Structures are given as C-alpha cells and as structure tokens.
C-alpha cells in the first residue's frame, strides 16, 4: 500500500471521555482519541475489544452514552449535524453483505443506495456503471446479491458505500472470512480510490495483523481501551518487536500477557503412522449447489492438518461429513480404516469435534459442562471426577470451574470447548475455526495445547482456519476454494512450488490460476464532484426508493407473498364456515311412555322442524345415558304416561327433556328451541279444539327479521371476518418487514443514510397497503361467490373504508415493530394485539353497546368496530356513504395517530 503523506489538517474525528456499555459489559472505557484525516486509519485488536462500537459512534449509527464525539467538524450528539454530515460518511458494517439485500440484484442494490442519496436517473446510470466496471462486477449486474461469493459481496458493499463519493469511509472488518485474492484486490481498489480522491479518510477495523501493516496509522485496542497509536513501524519500535502481532502482545497489560509463551512446535515424525482420516471424491450437494466437490486427502495419525480457505468454501461442510453429522452426496470417507457411519457410535467415540460456536451449555457451569460431556461419552461414573480435574488442570480452568460460560472471556470459553472435546480422550480432533476472534495471547495458548495433544498424545488434529499465520503452523495444509481443493502439502512446499515470498502470495497464485485471472488491478471508479447537495427535509424519492425495494423483495420471495394471499383465503374459508351461531340438525330421541296419537303427533311436530333430526327411540334410562355419553344424541325427551289423555282434558302436562350441556350457550339455544316447539304445538292443539269464534282475537302479532330473515350465521359472520383478516395479515406483514431488517442487520441503512424515519416507514408501508387491498378484493369475491352472501350496498363506500382500515392495520404493524427485535416476537405480538380486540371488543359476536367498563371503551376506539359496522351495513343493509359517513371519522383520526406514534417511537440510531 502506498503510504500517503499526512497533511496537517483537522482530525476527521475527535473523541473525548467516550464510554459505552451493553448491560454490565463495558464496550468502551473513557476513550480520548484524535483520528487524523486523509489517511488510512486502522483499529486493531481481537473481537470484543470495542472496535465496532467505536466505529458505530463515529458513523452516527449508535447513540452516544457518555463523552463527546466530533466528526467532520461537528458534534455527533446534535441531530442536525448528523443529518448534515450523513451524505459525507459511508459505513460498511461488519459481516459480508450485512447491509445488502440478498434478493435484489447487484445493480438493484447499488441503485437503491444511489436513490437514497438523491442521484437522478442519468447520474445513477453513470455512477453505477463506473463502479461495477471498476470492481469487476459488471458481468454480474443481474445476479442476486445472495448468490455472490464472499469477495463479490465485499466489492458490492464497497460500491454501495462509494456511490455518493464520501469524505469518510468506515469499514468494519471488511475482509474477515474472505479469500486472500479478494482481500488483496479489495485493498488495491481502496488504494486506487484514495489516490484519485485525496481528501478521503478511511477508517478500518481489522483482526488481521498482516493486513494492518498496510495502514498509515493504527489504534491498538483492548478491553474497550486504547493501548497505543501510531504507524505499524512506530508500534514495533515502541515495543521493540519484530512483528505487529508481537508488538500488540507486548502492549497488552502485564496481567494479560504474563502467561504468554511463544508456540513451540516439535517436528512431526510420521513413523509409518496409520491413516486416521481418508476422503475419496467426497462431494456434498444442496440442491443444485455443490458445496464440496470431489475432495481427496489422507491424514496420518498425530498430524496437524490444516484446511485453509474463506468462509463458504466448504470447510465446515467437509468436517461435518467426516464426523457423520452430514451424509455425503457422493464419495467415501474413512475414520481409522472404518467407513464413516452416523450409526457407528464406537468409531465416533474416537473423535472429538469443536464447532465454530463452541457448543457449550450456557446454563451449566464450567465443571458441569465437563461432567455432562463425560457422561455423554459414557465415561464410567467413578472416573469422571478425576477426568474433570485433569481437564481443569491441563486447560487452566481451575479458577473458573463454578462460573457460567457466557460470563467468561472468549479465550477461556475456547479452552473450555477444547477440554469438552477431548474429555473422552479421542484419537482424532476436528476443530472448525476455533481461534476466530480470539486475542493473540489466547490463540497462542490454544495452539500450544493442540501441539501437546498432537506430539505427546498422538492425537490427529484436523483444523480449519482462514488465518495465514496459523496455517503456517500446521504440518500440512490443504488450500480450498469454492468447494475444491486447489493444492495440498506442507506450507513450505506450497510456497516453494509457486516461487512466492509467503503462503498468502502462494494462495493468491493458486486462486488466480483456478479463476483464470491475471494480476492486473481493476480500474478505480471515476471520482465525481464531491460537493454534496444540501439535504432535503423530506424526500419522495427516498420514500419511493424504499417502496420499490420492498415490492421487489416481496415479489421475489414466493413464500411470503403466497402466504400473504393464500393464507388469507384459507383463513377466510376456515373462519367463514367454522364460526357459526346456527344450531341445526340436532339429533334427538324420544322415550315415549304414552304411545298415543298425541305423543306421536308431538314427536312428529319436533322432527318436522329443520332444527331437529329424529333418531331411533329410547327404551330405558340406561340407554338414554349411554347414547348421550357417546354423543349419539344431543336431546333426549321423555313423554310421560297419560300424556294424550291429559292434553284432551286440558290438564297441565310435563315433559322430561335432557340436553347435552357440554357447550352452555348451545344448550341454552336448544332449550329455547324445545320450549318454543312445545308451546307452538300446544297452541296448535288448542286452536283445533276451540270454536272459530274463540280463535279470533283483538290483534295478531307476527315477528319478522329484516336483513337476515332466516337468522343465519353466514350473512352476519362472513362480513365480520373480512375486517378481522384485514387487521391481522397486513399488520403482521408490515411488522415483519421492519423486524426482518433488524434481524438481518440491514436496518443499519436507516441509521447511516439520509433517510428519515417517516420516509422509511411510509415507504415500507405502501407495498403492504397494495397487498392488503388485493386481499380485500379476494375476500369480497369469496364472500359473494363462495359463501353466497350478496353485497347489497355501495361497494365504493366499502372499498374506501377498506383502504383507510388497511392503512391503519399496516400502521399498527409498524408501531408494533418498533418494540420487537425478532420475527417470532413480532408475529406473536401482532397476533395478540390485533386479534384479541378485534374478536372480543369490536362487535363481531357481542354488540359493542352490550359491553361494559374497559371492554366498552376499547370497542368504541378500536378501528375494527367501525369498519365491521360499515362492512355489515353495506353487505346486509344496502347502505352507502350518506348513511355511514360518521363511521369514517374515527378511521380518519386513527391514521395520523398510529403513523405519528410509529414514526415517533422508531429509533434513528441504535440504542
């Protein structure tokens, strides 16, 4: 890298007394630092030392807890300054593609960011074409970002960051997990851009010490504090160290580095050792994707064999196939001469496996973790205490035996995970990137433990890594890329074979050969006028940019869009037919102890009703009890002796009626039906026995039902289900759209771009309003053509009300999303908050006027109550806007209230 001469200009960022906490964890501890401008500044240190927290404060993505942060001449606590400098800062967060949208193409991702920064169509085309050409992504402009390699995602993220020509470029571990070739190309591209845009300041966090050698100025960090600053050469001179990693170790506090010892690796002596692991044409496919492509290797007992490659190249997949955790699609693998068989427990007991995530039980202490794994591997109970004590002593865990793993530093958790993996004394140890993110002292201690296991205990160690200095410690390594093994041998053999100066250069040469590339650097993008236009307060371009992006993602996610439509249809069918107040086809049986014409006439009168179905008669109380228990009948009727005679004499008669009371409301309805049928039969008998003169009365009253003459449930329930589903489904979808961004990390684009909270929420809301209206038309079609419930009133009135109601529903989803951080929580939270008021307090079953207390108040203010009345009014009563206009007023009031509250509660910075 060309080290640019430092020009005496004001610092690009100044921090004074900055502290940051996450719960009880101290991320930054009273940091005071001036970061020079117009140079490449690197923050170095392992994971968890505060690098990302520091960068997020400088970028404005995180709220400042304590202290002052000045960036580009202004205070980052000041919202106005943050808004003003936002177009001058670019932020590329940690994690490959974290700020990208994986269903969008390469072009669409860059275009989205260009729209956010206010570029018009012509300018966007020019800038995007230049960036894609300069980074070599032009041939892949139509490929979805999710299908790019790690290096290509890295370049795409850089394109998105550079689309607005920033003055400050912030890169948070941009090359972690990327292959050496992509890493080298990335930094060459950054160098070229800086040469053309001399006023650009670049701030980088990295865990690679070799990478940090290239930077102009370094900030060494540990435990949230700054250890030292200066160039790499200055840090080496200050600590009298040969390498930057050695300098970093010497800068650590005495208590932390006192246990450090240089790793000593005795030469490996094969001595005709047996083969511990052998793979022949091992292949793994996931659909059409080939994760591992015909891999071959042989590893003798006691060897440290390294798998070197970038994230996603197939290392972890290969290891899982070797341990039997994943069945191979093709090829064969052997452990100690036996074919790999997931069911062969004896062979698997000879293997220890340590995953990237360490696989510890956080609710158990260190000692309990060791004891549990000892029992899982069937170590005799009497031997467990001694074995646990041995592991604690060997891996230096005695002082933390009663502490939970999540409370331990990363390096100690790493040693505990290794102790757990070897507690059953395996003959082979498979380690999947065990040192990722660990500080150099802990990494060297871990390596010394591995070397002792290999050389003293003759344990075969198969380790994957993407650190070059670790690969050089292995007896042999295999260079892997895109599922294929490029070369195998000792590190020295691979370097000599390529005539390279280092293992990294050799790996790059192998990668170039595999890809058919040359060493020609990519052309840097043309630098445009970096004068940033004044930022607009509210931009429809940014709003519609989010709407367009959300619509594209929704269209390309068939599961989400299909469930949104088909889920509504299915729920409508289930609820329309499933929710019914109708009590019909009641099976009854009669215990007739009279057996006269009158008793038979009474029975025929009951069976002639559409509400009752007669079953074979009863003969005894025992049969009555048995058939009612079995659910064969719902109603049992006993007609007493002399029933007909008493009727003829006008003597009062009594019938015995047994009703299944498992459902009280249904039983009450059945009781009313039987009483009504009995009274009707008595009146009919009396009318036949009376004279014509006596039959005439002063008046004759008949009851008629308007709007629903047959008192059927469908005409009442179906129009009520429409508001219920239009509240639940659109609100869930809109809530998930925001929470999904929080989970994936792309919410960072809201924090660090000029987008306002209102632009973000309104932009995301529009596609779901359109989808909600489509759902509305589907539900109306089902109501009319499937359920046979005609719509008699003004459909325009119902459509207008539905539009307002869906705006409220999606707004409620956005409001709920401001409190939720996971999609599962968003689904449950939205379901509870929308379904309970809609079903219990909005008049779906019981009228709002019949409610009391808080339930009545909820029913009066909840939007579903008003839209449900409009839906029933237009469906059943043929009403229009002139009849229903007053019900629109609460809906119109609710929209600004819900949306205003959502915008107010949405955070523009991470808390």
Curated annotation (Swiss-Prot):
Gene Ontology CC terms, in alphabetical order: cell pole; cytosolic small ribosomal subunit; membrane; plasma membrane
Domain annotation ABC transporter: ranges: 13-248, 277-507
Keyword vocabulary terms for this entry = ATP-binding, Cell inner membrane, Cell membrane, Hydrolase, Membrane, Nucleotide-binding, Repeat, Transmembrane, Transmembrane helix
- Say if the entry is tagged with keyword Lyase: no
One Pfam family this chain carries?
ABC_tran
Q: Name one GO biological process term.
A: positive regulation of translation
Query: Which compartment or compartments is the protein found in?
Result: Cell inner membrane
Q: Which SUPFAM superfamilies match?
A: P-loop containing nucleoside triphosphate hydrolases (SSF52540)
Q: What happens when the gene is disrupted?
A: Deletion mutant is slightly elongated at both 15 and 32 degrees Celsius and displays a significant loss of translation fidelity.
Molecular functions (GO terms): ABC-type transporter activity; ATP binding; ATP hydrolysis activity; ribosomal small subunit binding
**Residue numbers binding ATP 1:** 45-52
Q: Main role? A: Exhibits an intrinsic ATPase activity that is stimulated by both 70S ribosomes and 30S ribosomal subunits. Could be involved in protein-chain elongation and in release of deacyl-tRNA from ribosomes after peptide bond synthesis. Stimulates the synthesis of polyphenylalanine in vitro.
Return the similarity comment.
In the C-terminal section; belongs to the ABC-2 integral membrane protein family. Belongs to the ABC transporter superfamily.
Quaternary state and interactors:
Interacts with both 70S ribosomes and 30S ribosomal subunits, and with 16S RNA. Binds EF-Tu. Co-purifies with the inner membrane protein YhjD.
According to UniProt, the name of this protein is Ribosome-associated ATPase
What species is given as this protein's source?
Answer: Escherichia coli (strain K12)
